[in-house]
Amino acid sequence: MEKEETSLHWHGLILPYELDGVPYLTTAPIKAGETQVYKFPLLQSGTYWYHSHTKLQEQNGMHGALIIHKRHAEPMPEQVLILSEWTDMKPFEVHRRLHSANDWSAIKKHQIRPGTVQSYSDAIKDGALGVKLTNEWKRMNAMDVSDVYYDLLFANGKPVDETRQFKAGERVRVRLINGGASSYFWITYAGGKMTVVASDGIDVEPVEVDRFIMGIAETYDIIVTIPADSTAYELLATSEDRVRSTSLWLGSGIRQLAAPLQPLKYFEGMQMMNDMMKMNGDLDDMGMNMSLQQMDMNVVMYPEITGAKENSHADHGNDRYNSNALSDIVTLNYAMLRSPTSSALPPGPLKEMRFELTGNMNRYLWAIDNKTVSETDRILIRKGENVRIILYNNSMMRHPMHLHGHFFRVVNGQGDHAPLKNVLDIMPMETDTIEFAATETGDWFFHCHILYHMMSGMGRVFSYENTAPNPQLPDARKAARIFARDDKEWHFMVQNDFATNGNDGEAMYMNKRWNLQSEWRLGYMKEHGQEVETHFGRYFGKMQWLFVNVGLDWRTREGHEGGAPRDNLFGQVNTKDSRTVAHFGFQYTLPMLLVLDLRIDTDGQLRSQLMREDIPLTPRLRLDLMGNSDLEYMGRFRYVLDKTWALSTHYDSDMGLGVGVMLTY
């Protein structure tokens, strides 16, 4: 690369930690224009891959397959398939917009799969108005199973790939790699069942399935049969949100399609989340003890399992989220994986820890125990220990957790034959246990492999005690500061309504905890007045519903009808037409996503405000409402044209009626 530094992580390989490829943690970055040579012994075989671990480069396609064959393996035709995605939007822009709670991705998906926005018009159409209202009462935004809209999915870097050399009766080993930045893939095959024989490069006892889902960064080896000549059979990879798909065609001739996955039933999923979400944002599994993907709460949205009609909440007892109990379609889960050889840990002291996976979509903060990588110390472990980690996912998103430089046992009821993996997908409300032998030295990253979650801080660093200084990073303190920068990034957002009656907008410059925001209302005539407010503060709580801030409030208005000032709602003299004060206060998100703003200023004046923005009346038509104790009020309709522009009309108690265009960045 000519203009920026990069790195190379050897995903799943056992190698010296200083070659692991995490810049500023284990390895020096590869500077622009430089060449880096990696030399290490190969200690394993299987399906692996490599990718950049620098910023968001992986989203731009900096990855590839790494296949290590056994010295003495059964001869079999094979095909490598690395799955990935492409967005026309720059990855930095994707990341910035995720932190602004912007739902342009959902609007784009709606064009392909109607219903993804889950607007009020969608709810009424589906007879789910009560479900939508309950969802917002519990302070949740619309449900989505993936964060990002992608313009294309790729099979080996192509929208569709094909291999024509396979003949009838041949058994083909397909080495599947999910090289996506944030996409899960459902895998199905037009030629019949698939036999899973390896996961994350390590053999498992063969298990026959109809389909399985691949978490980000997972690899699976499957064996499929080519049923007949003169036919090409589709190996179909469908994104979890079912908006896009890509294919690998095996064989030549007439194309035999795999059955496409039908659109998700989003309001069934919303009802499920309503049932399981507490008012404080915690999740309640209702005593189901979910683990190992056996109880998939999303099954209520799958029409191929629960039927096309809205009957997914029929009483099926403890099996109501178990797809294998509800259907003849066999879906792989981790409990079905078994190592062909013993994976028992060696004797040694046990170090046990518990991690709670936390996060919220509104401000896109993802963490472990509500702390990001930069907010925690490295976790010390000793060589010779056995480390057990109990993971509970208390967030609404699934997380593929990846451990560098080690394979862990997935404790799944198989005893000494628990499967070995380096990535484990943990679904909402699941509790899963992994354990590994601490046999290495140095520092090793443990993180969510959804790229934008990792960049937001969802991870930890395991550090072996008594590790010698890393020659790759001679200034360890400086390297640690640079490594911690990723989840400290600040993001700028602005929204401005260029209307006929004035200019109305806000700007924010914020990171994971802090926010500097400014609002303005600038009338074109002196009786409309001018107002500017600025706030700086910190968000508190796991869900970040509380924002404590200090700020400045300046406003002036001349010749306003009504003469002498009126009292405000608190019985104090209303100073809304002339005010220059500092203030202290807080904003708190109430049920129905109403934001309460309560403050006291340096003149002793109390002020309160209720506001609700971005009410989705239809997928593109939005409503904003505001009222405050100064007896001001506002209502605005916006029709979203694209990710930047919207048509608007609003009525403001001071500036009157106006129409215009709104900019969102």
Describe the predicted segments one by one.
Residues 1-216, 222, 255-289, 293-295, ...:
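Histidine-centered copper-binding motifs that mark active-site loops
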Residues 505, 534-536, 584-586, 608-612, ...:
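Membrane-embedded beta-strands of outer-membrane beta-barrel proteins
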Residues 190-204, 371-373, 394-421, 452-453, ...:
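Active/binding-pocket-proximal capping segment
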Residues 21-23, 368, 416, 530-534, ...:
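Outer-membrane beta-barrel translocator domains and adjoining extracellular loop/strand segments
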